[in-house]
Amino acid sequence: MEKTSYVMTSSYEIEKQLINREWTEDQIGNEYRKHPSLRYLHSSHNFETGMTGVAFEDTTTKEIIIGYAGTNTTNDAWNDIRTDVVDIFAGAGGHYQSAFDFYEEVKNRYGDRITTVTGHSLGGNYAQMVAIEYNIPNGVVYNSAPLYLGTTELVKGGMNLYNASRQPYLAHIHTKDIQKLLVVENKINNYTGDMVRIRSKDDILNVGSEVGLGYS
């Protein structure tokens, strides 16, 4: 837990440097505060989606931990809030590709040693989807935004309505959302890793999840 907490916290600090272009990646590696058993490897910020990923190596096991920064209301507020509202509340899920790309980049650079993903808030959402997409053995997420919120039940309701009425236009409206939902559910069901979720009761996104509006 202590290592994932460190990586999660570091993701926010490194994100600030990447957005403001205050440090190059080499400077981050050379100047970033040290951890007794973790070594900084790589980081990246996607200016279109607001995704920031960081990678650290456990110097004892040589395993890699990937962390994703969460919603940032100071540095890249618009992209993160847009992702929260459009992609999570609306179930669009369009932000995941940048998180997948970062995972693939780290894997290609450093080998298939990624055993843990972590993140807070929106970053926890990224971490969960990356974990189930690549069946990563371990995940620790903090107050994670759910994978889907709001439209999950609406989509299911739309399918029920379509089945009852057999009206083609209803199928057209809901087909894409239903397909996305079923794909996510299938990946969740096939995930064999261990996902630890740490949350506080007053987190607004998790409140929605707890009443049955999403997966987290």
Describe the function of each predicted region.
Residues Y6-T118, Y134-N138, A145-G157:
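A conserved cap/lid and substrate-binding interface adjacent to the catalytic center
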Residues G53, Y126-M129:
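Generic recognition of flexible, low-complexity loop/linker segments
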Residues T60-E63, I132, I136-S216:
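Serine hydrolase/lipase
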Residues T118-G123, A127:
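Gly/Ala-rich beta-loop-alpha elbow adjacent to hydrolase catalytic centers
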